[in-house]
Swiss-Prot record:
InterPro entries (alphabetical): ABA_GPCR_dom, Golgi_pH-regulator_cons_dom, GPHR/GTG
Location in the cell: Cell membrane; Endoplasmic reticulum membrane
Listed GO CC annotations: endoplasmic reticulum membrane; plasma membrane
Protein name: GPCR-type G protein COLD1
BP GO terms, sorted: cellular response to cold; response to abscisic acid
GO molecular function: abscisic acid binding; GTPase binding
Parts forming coiled coils: 243-279
Annotated family: Belongs to the Golgi pH regulator (TC 1.A.38) family.
Length: 468
């Protein structure tokens, strides 16, 4: 292979990674971040890298099928991508996430670096011990090998993927169908906005009181010099009075600080609730447009697929079946059985199934992310810190999710492509285990999500009016 081909293939690989990384940053800043959230440069870079390497895995699958680039270039791209992605997931992200949590908690930089290094060692030990409880490749070649690391990441990733898919299978009809959309009264939003303004004004007033109390303490402490010029009895009386005043002022400041923190937390929750109500009002108006009606029809179609997937996964878990033909392949096969137009059923259904499943994956991840954001904002008192934690957590999930997707998609590919992916990931990996593991967790996640969303819908139904 000449230098021209090397430069061309290297340019294609580099340009695709740069493009995917830019797309990841655009998605993070335009879709996930909100206007009021602080953004850290290094966190965005890590997210962009994980996004690029993760999406490149799917791109490499397409490169194998089309094919694009030479066989040697694709092989090197596979190994480079997996090496960089595993390095980020197993070493860089856990270390930096722990370091950032410590720094946000006020720990000094040197101590945070040391504690994060100790945490990484504990994480690696737990990561290794996890393999004892699941089917893993032979450990003869060591722990830090591609099959060992991919297998352990696959267990976590398939679990996360099954939870997301189970949640998405239930949340998708709830989010897309106008049947579950409720009209938001503008007066409810105005009431919350008045409460927010009152909370912020009260918070500002109490902060002013804190400043005045601190100035009073400084005045009392400054009067100590004047007491020295007085008689002994007056100095004793003045010292006692000053001590009582300082104690009372300190108690007032502590009480005001606690009230300010509570008011800031209340203001943050009110702000998020107002934002969510505004979004729900926009969604209700959108559902009345022609695009909203089209989305409603799409929601019914995807809901049928979700119900089918839940039933087939339940059947697989109960009867321990290896899996059956997906509905897309079944529909195309029945159609072409009566109308033979010379199309390869397996290849066509493979592409359509991946597109259909991909839509469910994207929607479920976005829905799950929204709930993760709510959780972190509810339990954290530092808004920017919680946002950073969510992005790093999402980066970890995303990388494991995409590696696990390759483990599961491999079974849907033709034998010639399946062999290539098997060689790249490691021939000792127990691929069938991941399909059984996915079905079991998917069923549990779907039924649990059904219970939670039903409870949420029931609790809110009395406060909102259905759309005509």
């Amino acid at each position: 292979m000449g230098w021209g081909a090397v430069v061309y293939e290297g340019g294609v690989v580099g340009a695709s990674l740069v493009g995917l990384g830019w797309a990841g940053l655009w998605f993070l800043n335009r879709r996930l971040y909100k206007e009021y959230e602080e953004r850290r440069a290094l966190v965005q870079i890590l997210f962009g890298l994980v996004f690029a390497f993760s999406c490149n895995l799917f791109q490499l699958v397409l490169f194998e099928i089309l094919p694009v680039l030479s066989k040697h270039a694709r092989f090197l791209n596979w190994h480079l991508d997996l090496f960089c992605l595993i390095l980020l997931l197993v070493f860089v992200l856990p270390y930096y996430h722990c370091y950032l949590l410590l720094r946000n908690s006020g720990v000094r930089r040197e101590r945070a670096l040391l504690v994060a290094a100790l945490f990484l060692l504990v994480f690696l030990y737990g990561f290794w011990r996890m393999g004892i409880h699941f089917p893993m490749p032979s450990p003869e070649k060591g722990f830090f090998t591609m099959p060992q690391l991919v297998s352990r990441i696959g267990v976590i990733g398939v679990s996360v993927m099954a939870v997301l898919s189970g949640f998405g299978a239930v949340n998708l009809p709830y989010s897309y169908l106008s049947l579950f959309i409720r009209e938001i009264d503008e007066m409810d939003i105005k009431t919350l906005e008045r409460q927010l303004m009152q909370s912020m004004e009260t918070c500002i007033a109490k902060k002013k009181k804190i400043v005045l109390s601190k100035m009073e303490m400084e005045r009392i402490q400054g009067s100590e010099e004047k007491l020295k010029a007085r008689s002994f009895l007056k100095r004793i009386v003045g010292t006692v009075v000053r001590s009582v005043q300082e104690d009372q002022t300190e108690q007032d400041i502590k009480s005001l600080d606690a009230e300010v923190q509570a008011l800031e937390e209340l203001s943050k929750q009110l702000f998020l609730e107002i934002y969510e109500l505004r979004q729900a009002k926009i969604a209700a108006a959108f559902s009345r447009t022609w695009r909203g009606h089209a989305q409603n029809l799409l929601g019914y179609a995807l809901s049928v697929y979700c119900v089918y997937k839940m039933l087939k996964s339940l059947q697989s878990v109960v009867f321990k079946e290896a899996g059956s033909v997906d509905p897309v392949t079944m529909t195309i096969t029945i159609f072409l059985r009566h109308f033979d137009i010379g199309i390869d059923v397996t290849l066509l259904s493979q592409y359509i199934s991946l597109i259909f499943i991909g839509m469910l994956v994207v929607i479920s991840v976005r829905g799950f992310l929204a709930n993760v954001m709510k959780f972190f904002f509810a339990v954290s008192r530092v808004g920017s810190g919680s946002t950073t934690n969510v992005v790093l957590f999402l980066s970890e999930i995303m990388g494991m999710y995409f590696i696990s997707s390759i483990l599961l998609i491999r079974k849907s590919l033709a034998n010639e492509y399946r062999v290539i992916i098997t060689d790249v990931l490691g021939g000792d990996i127990q691929f069938d285990f991941y399909h059984r593991w996915f079905d079991a967790i998917f069923v549990a996640s779907a039924f649990l999500s059904l219970l939670l969303i039903s409870a949420q819908y029931t609790s809110r139904q009395t406060d909102k009016h259905p759309i005509d």
